Amino acid sequence: MRNSDNYGEITRKAKVKHGIWTGVKYFFLALWAIIVLFPFYWMVLTSLKDYGAYNSEYIPKFFTLYPTLANYAEAFTAVPLARYFMNTLLFTVVTTALMLIVITLAAFAFARLEFRGKRIAFTLLLSLMMIPNELVIITNFVTITDWGLRNTFTGLILPSVTSVFYIYLLKENFAQVPDELYYASKVDGASDMAYLTRVLIPICSPTLVTVIILKVIECWNSYVWPRLITDDSRYFLVSGGIQAIREGGFGRDNIPAMMAAVVAISVPLIALFLIFRKKIMEGVSRGGLKG
């Protein structure tokens, strides 16, 4: 009987301890979620406030009783934001497609093919990750300028069609596929390209989807390179367009409309991430596993 009482007491204390720890954990998680989400909430809230109401707030309010969508209409009419969207869409689609071809072929060569200097070449490729991005931008800018490709989509796209990190990620994923599949395809008379397209790519599709999504996000958020290589508004992306809005005085005078433009630009990426977040995590974990 005594042992039973002791066991019950131990169980009760364990449950209390577990409950306290769970409560503390969820408290800090909730606090962290608020810290992370508050800037986006404030951005959306500001975009829904009337211009006059916003300027009359000496003390900022955390809600609005009279939300309005007029700021969104003004954001698209005050500047050619729709054109910036189309430019960004074109830049993102073409860059992602070309990069996917380049990194897939490069990753396949390093993962499966045998050629002289393969290890040295791969080591040199990885060493490029150690070079500061600022130095690469300077080199790319001089090269694109010498080729006469400033203020062109070609100049925007060319420096972004490859990525050492994505080649490494995809190469590690390709290397996990059993060698027996490669030898079996060779016995069946398949070429290396047939093995790549019919076997490797379907098996490694989660990683490829991850790379595509991450590249789309990267292209959509590009600012430094597009801003550096283009000064013609016909080639502005949404990021450069927002800066043009602000420099033109519109953003300084009408913060709610400025926030409406930022929300409109952010929503596609947020939706993309929320829809494919499981694919992203699955692809990254697959690329980082050995065996």
Enumerate the language-model features and the residues they cover:
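A structural signal for multi-pass alpha-helical bundles of membrane permease subunits
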Residues: 2-17, 21-291
